[in-house]
A protein has these predicted regions:
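Short catalytic micro-motifs in class I SAM-dependent methyltransferases
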Residues: 107-111
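Class I (Rossmann-like) S-adenosyl-L-methionine-dependent methyltransferase catalytic domain
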Residues: 1-43, 47-98, 112-190
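A conserved beta-strand element that flanks and buttresses the S-adenosyl-L-methionine
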Residues: 104
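Conserved acidic residues
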Residues: 101
Length: 190
């Protein structure tokens, strides 16, 4: 996905992006949308799987995909149940074994090299069923020397609006060090 040594980070526990809990924006969205259509969810770049477990606790069947073998193994150790699975894989390069009703973005898009972002959009289209939902917590920072790499609303709109209908956009509750820097988007694939 990028030239970053994600496996090395997980092997040495150098994972400052892991906050030990699901995205506050996701937790709030799940609580506010108890009638959202249940189904399958893919969480690319899932790390230790906190977001995967949040989706599963809300009644979805969730798969966490990560490029780091250590992240996947540790995610499994933290906990799995009949609604959670974790799998080693490259979201950008792998062909999907199935398509999902939902794809959830949280820190994967900003972690990849900016020149791979078109690949990311194509990957979402491969993994997501037509009419499926793409829910994203985007981290808006100006830094171009990532990861995380800078992104803004204009880029998100330019990349996703040709393929998705924007249903909702808002500023979510965030981790303390990201307050005011995250924006959530709820999209439906055309």
């Amino acid at each position: 996905m990028s030239s970053t040594d994600w496996e090395g980070h997980y092997q040495t526990n150098d994972t400052p992006w892991d906050k030990g809990e699901a995205s506050p924006g996701l937790v709030d969205w799940l609580a506010a949308h108890p009638d959202a259509p249940r189904g399958t969810v893919l969480v690319p770049g899932c790390g230790l799987g906190h977001d995967v477990r949040a989706w599963a606790a809300a009644g979805f069947t969730a798969l966490g995909l990560d490029i780091s073998p250590s992240a996947v193994e540790r995610a499994k150790l933290v906990g799995v149940n009949e609604r959670t699975k974790f799998r080693l894989g490259d979201f950008l390069a792998d062909e999907p074994h199935e398509q999902f009703d939902w794809v959830f973005e949280h820190t994967c898009f900003c972690a990849i090299q900016p020149d791979r972002r078109a690949d990311y959009v194509r990957a979402v289209l491969r993994w997501l069923k037509p009419g499926g939902h793409y829910l994203a917590v985007n981290y808006f920072i100006p830094d171009k020397d990532g990861p995380p790499f800078g992104v803004d609303r204009d880029e998100i709109w330019a990349r996703f609006s040709p393929h998705f209908e924007l249903l909702e956009e808002w500023t979510p509750r965030s981790y303390p060090n990201r307050t005011g820097l995250e924006r959530m988007f709820s999209w439906r694939r055309r």
